[in-house]
């Protein structure tokens, strides 16, 4: 279970564009109190709750995509 953070890289992109490993699946998306019927064309929004099922190391790799993108630092 992961909450899509504002500024996350996945926001606005269709689920079908995610290059998830074959062992990882999005099984549900909640928007507010509503369970949404989703498809590959569905785009995630901030505060969506995404239920993912997969291997632990694959999930660990993908979780940062649902979190806020790190601000780039100037040198």
Language model region names:
Residues 1-68, 73-75:
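Cytosolic Rossmann-like ligand/nucleotide-binding regulatory domains
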């Amino acid at each position: 279970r992961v909450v899509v953070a504002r500024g996350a890289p996945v926001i606005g992109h269709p689920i079908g564009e995610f290059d998830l490993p074959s062992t990882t699946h999005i099984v549900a998306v909640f928007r507010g109190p509503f369970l949404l019927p989703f498809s590959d064309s569905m785009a995630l929004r901030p505060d969506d709750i995404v239920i993912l099922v997969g291997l632990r190391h694959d999930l660990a790799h993908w979780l940062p995509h649902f979190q806020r993108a790190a601000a780039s630092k100037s040198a």
